[in-house]
Amino acid sequence: MNIRPIEDADLLEVQRVAQVTWLHAYKEIYPEKAILTFLSQAYSLDRLRDLLRTDSNKLRRLFYVVATEDGIVGYGELVERGFAEYELTRIYLLPEFQGKGMGKRLLNQLINDVYPLRQMFAWVEKENGGGRSFYESMQFHVEEEIEDNFFGTVTHLLKYVREWE
């Protein structure tokens, strides 16, 4: 397993991983049409190329992939939101690679590659039990709950926060 910054050659595989993981994680929460609409926007090749260019400066965004002999099996993105404050905007692994410590290794790599780090947060769908368990196992706690609208579906998001001194 190799955790590294995303490269242009990874974009199609990241799209594939996004489609599989989003349908797996959210199929019981959101309508499939909403998920597919989101994926077509957030994971279009143009959007991913924009993220790749932004990532190249390594100052405000880290976008890493988890690569194995099977190809790209996961990815994570960390975005600076303020001094020493970062939002984990996405972290996903293919279902067959979950529960093997890869997500923890990916998150720890992202954490290790930013300095200074005072606070990290992530918005998690309240109904996403697997996601919630992951963040809780990584010492995040719920700080806030908001109501959101995901392509016509009313949903509740939890803000998970972890702080460092």
Task: Please provide the spans of the model-predicted regions.
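Acetyl-CoA-dependent GNAT
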Residues: 5-9, 16-96, 107-113, 148, ...
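Conserved GNAT acetyl-CoA-binding A-motif
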Residues: 114-124
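Extreme N-terminal starter segment of soluble prokaryotic enzymes
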Residues: 1-3
